[in-house]
Amino acid sequence: QLSEHGMNGNDFKINSKILKDIIGGYTRESGVRNLEKQIAKLIRNRAKNIVSKTEVNDSKDENYLKNILGPKKFFKDKYENNLVAGVVTGLAWTSVGGEILFIESSISDGKGNLTITGNLGKIMKESAIIALEFIKSNFNELGINKAIDYSKYNIHIHVPEGATPKDGPSAGITILTSLVSLFTQKRVKKNIAMTGEITLRGKVLPVGGIKEKILAAKRANIKEIILSSYNRKDIEEVNQKYLKGLKFIYVDTMKDVIFYALTNRKVQNPKLI
């Protein structure tokens, strides 16, 4: 990049903090093409300053990147500790790497309708249907009130950031945990996320993109990850330095997930369902 703009290492330097800010705020990709484009913009700005003998944008200025690259396009994933029922953190894999996502469920008086929003694909919607049917068949083992008449309630499942398309089976256990939390009004444990496919029998199946999901969890300061026991081999293949500070809980069934993910504490002002 420097040679292409007629410059050398003495003309332009970039410190590690700025580089991290570029990666985190302006690029989110599996490669480095967009990173190179952003750095090229900084180099061109520096070249212009040299020619005009001015220093309009000082790299020590906190607005340095904003002045040249514009406002941030991406923001650091952050785990949210919710005190309401039905909100669970999941891990997803996209074309640009791992992401965390929040599954939100709510219930209201109605006629038994299930609404699913958040720009979700067919597979993810099917996971929501499977989760609800599993709950109806296993309410007793999940600690859910057997007297609930589902035909008298509407259930709404939402995944925020609706502008971003989402699909795949890996949110299955997150959706089911969200619904169980909603029906029992129990809190989800702090700093925990999960990923895994579910079946109508309540089995937890393995999913892909594990390394990318681990990196997303670390960015969000998540401490524990629930995943299928079949994914254990994928964890063993990941460089140990990426696993530091993380605890993995391997499960075979959804009952294992609920047992570990939910606390016995009710949320504040629980709903009577």
Regions found by a protein language model. Name each.
Residues 1, 22, 65, 179-180:
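Broad structural signal for hydrophobic residues in well-ordered alpha-helices, predominantly aliphatic
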Residues 1-40, 45-58, 141-148, 186-189:
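Conserved C-terminal "switch" segment of AAA+ ATPases
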Residues 20, 33, 37-40, 63, ...:
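Non-catalytic, well-ordered alpha-helical scaffold segments
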Residues 22-25, 68, 260:
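Residues that form generic nucleotide/phosphate-binding pockets
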Residues 28-91, 123:
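Glycine/threonine-rich ATP-lid/beta-loop region of ATP-binding domains
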Residues 57, 74-80, 84-89, 97-273:
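Peripheral, non-AAA+ core regions of ATP-driven protein-machinery
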